[in-house]
Amino acid sequence: MKKLFILLFCFLPLTIFAQNQLNGYVYEANEEQKENPLPGANLVWLNTTVGTSTEFDGSFSLPLSKTSNQLVISYVGFKTDTIKVNSSKTIKHWLEPTTSLDEVVLDSKVKSTSRSYIQSENIQYVSSDELLKAACCNLSESFETNPSIDVNFSDAVTGTKQIKMLGLSSPYILIATENIPSVRGASQAYGLSFIPGTWVESIQITKGAGSVVNGYESISGQINAELQKPFTDDKLFVNAYAASNERLELNTHFNTKVSKNISTGVYLHGNTHQEEHDRNDDGFLDMPKFNQINVMNRWQYTNTQKGIVTFLNLKYLDDYKQSGQIDFDPDTDKLTTNNWGSEIDTKRYEISGKFGYVNSDLPWQSLGIQMALSNHQQDSYFGLNEYNIEHTSVYSNVIYNSIISDTRHKIKTGVNFTYDNYDEFALNTNYDRVERSFGGFFEYSFDNLKKFNLTAGLRFDTHNLLGEFITPRFHLRYSPWSKSAFRASFGRGKRSANIFTENQNLFASSRQFSILNNNGPIYGLDPEIAWNYGVSYLQGFNLFGRKADVTFDFYRTDFKNQVVVDLENAQAVSFYNLQGSSYANSFQVEVNYEAFNNFDLRTAYKYYDVKTDYQTGKLSKPLTPKHRFFANAEYKTELKNQSQWKFDATFNWLGEQRFSSTIDNPIQYQLNKFTPTVATLNMQVTKVFSSKFEVYLGGENITNVKQDNPIVSANAPFGTAFDTNFVYGPIFGSMYYTGLRYKLN
C-alpha cells in the first residue's frame, strides 16, 4: 500500500487547467531548409514582458498574448524577426544570419559550444561543429576539445580511453543516447568507443546530479548524445580516415525519404588497426590490434499535424581487440605462460525506440515513451585472467509533460522500469545476478525567464537488491543582472558497483583480487550512495569590443558509501565498503573570448581534491592530477563561394599525479610517489572546398611526449610485480592523420 501511495502521488498533477499556448521551433536558415535548431533563441510578444527561449532542439512553448499578436524572435548573430501570429497552430521559423552578401558570406556565429543564461541546470551544449575540431572517431574521443571532461588511457595494453567528470570516473556519470542510458553495466569499460563520432549530432553535458526523469544512478553528471536524424541528415555522407599509426576508418550514412512522414537511414562504421608498434622497446604492443564493425538502421516518423514523432533504432556491433607482447600468438599462447597476451571479443545487439506525442488541442501537454532492449556479450582474457560477461538489459520510461496555469509552471511525471540480467565469469567463479527496478518520478519547474527559475524533482524506486529509496534533485538559477546566471544544485545518487567490468584494466596485471565480503546484495558489497552539491556562475561581457564569457564552477561529491578499489598493495587489489569518508571537490574557471573576427579562444583551469579513506589512511585518488590547464584556439577564414579554411589547436597541461604505492615490489620495480607533469598539443587544419566536400589533416601529441616504461615488470609479465595500470601520459608519441568528408544533400 505504501508503494502504491507514493507512486500515485507522482501522478496527482496530471489533471490541470491551462491557458492557450503557442508551440513551435526556431531553426538556422539554410539553402536546404534543414531543421538545424537554434537553442537559446529568445521569443517575446511585442510591447510585453511575456516570453520564453528555445530548448536544445529549437522547440518552445509560451502563452498566447491578449494584447499582442506580434512575436519577436531574436538570436545573437542573427537578424531579429517579428512575425504575426493569429492562431495557436505549431509554427516553424528560420532565422537569417546578420551578415549575408552575394559574394562573401560570414559564418553565422552559432557557437560550437554554448551555455544557457536561463536554464536552471548547468548544461553545456556541444554541436557537431565542435566534434569536427578533432578526429572524433568515437564518443570517447569527442571530448578532447572540452575542458569539462578529462580523457585518459586506463592502461598500457587495451588502449581504452576513460573519461572523468568532477574528478570521478565514468561509472558515476549517466551516459545516454537520446536520453536512453546506453553506457552502463557490461558496456561501461568500452561502451564509449562503440558510438561512432559521425553518428552524433550534438552532445549535452550536465554537471551535477541531473534530472530525476533519467533515473537514480547519476552522481557526478550526465552526458547525452543526440544522434543524426534521417529527416535532416545528408542523403549520403562519407568520412574516410587514415593515421600514421596505420589505423584506418570508414563511415558512411545513407538516408532516404520513404514517404511524406517516414525517413530511414543506414549508418555504417568500420575501423581496423593490424600493425605492430613497439616504440619504447619493452616487448609489448604500444596499441592493440583491432577490428570493429558497427551498423545502425534508424527510422523516423514525423507528423506535425498530429503532433507525433517516433524513432526506431536497430544496432549491431562486432568489436575485437588483441594486445600484449609482440611475439604473442593467440592460437598457441592463449592462457599460457608462453607469451603474455589478451583478446577481447565483444558482440552487441540493440533495439531502441522513442515515441512522442503533443496534444494538438492542448499543446502544452505531451507524452513520451522510451524503450530499449540490448544484449551485450564479451569473451576475454588478460594473460592468465579469464573474464566473460553477458548482459541482457531492458529499459522503459514513460514521461508526461504539462503545465499548471501557465508556462511558468511546468511539470514532468512518469514511471520507468529497468531489468538487468548478468551472467559473469571472473576469477574462475560465476557471479550471476538479476536486477529489477520500478520507479515513479515527479519534477516541477518554475520559469521566470528574466531573473529566476528552479527545478525540483523527486523519485521513488523499488529495487529487488537495493530495496526502496527516494531520490531528490534540485536546481535553481538566478540572474542578478544582464548576461549573468548564478546556479546552485544538489542531489542524491545510488548505484550498483559492477566491480569487475568497471575495473577490467586490473586484470592486465598480476595483482591478487580480494573482496572483503560485508554480506551486501552485490558481490557481498553494499550499493554506492553519494550526494552532489554545486554552484556555478556564468557572466557574459565585452572585452575590447568583443564578446566574451567566464564561468566559475565548484562541485563537491560526498559518498555515504563507496565501493573502494584499493591498490595500495602493489601486488593486490581489494574491494570493500567505505570505512570513513570519501569526497571529490572540483573547481573550474573557463573563459571564452572572440579575440577578433572568426578567431575564438577558450581557456580553462581546473583543480581537483579527491580523497578516500583507505585501510592505510586517507589518500588522494591515484592518477588524478590536482591541477590542469586547458586552451583551445579556433580560426576560420571568411566563407567565400562555399570555400574556407579552418584551423584548430588544443593544449593540455596536467600537473603531477599520485602513483598508488609500489613499495611492496622488488626495488627495480618501485616507482616514484608522483608522476612528472605532462603537456600535449593537438592541431588540425580543414579545407572546405564546398558544402559537399572537405579534407582535413591533423596531429595528436605533436610535441611527441612519451611516458617512459608504462608497464611495470614488462620483462617478467608472469611475475608478481607485473602491472599495466600506471599510465599517466601518451605511450605512442606523436600521431598524424588525414581524412575527407563528402556530403550529398
Where do the language-model regions lie?
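N-terminal periplasmic accessory domains that precede
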Residues: 88-94, 139-142, 161-164, 176, ...
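Short acidic/polar hinge/loop motifs at secondary-structure boundaries
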Residues: 60-63, 162, 180-207, 295
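Gram-negative outer-membrane beta-barrel transporters
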Residues: 554-558, 577-660
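C-terminal beta-signal and adjacent terminal beta-strands/loops
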Residues: 494, 560, 653-662, 686-745
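Membrane-embedded beta-barrel scaffold of Gram-negative outer-membrane proteins
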Residues: 366-380, 479, 487, 524-577, ...
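Flexible loop and strand-edge segments within Gram-negative outer membrane beta-barrel domains
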Residues: 273-294, 300-367, 373-391
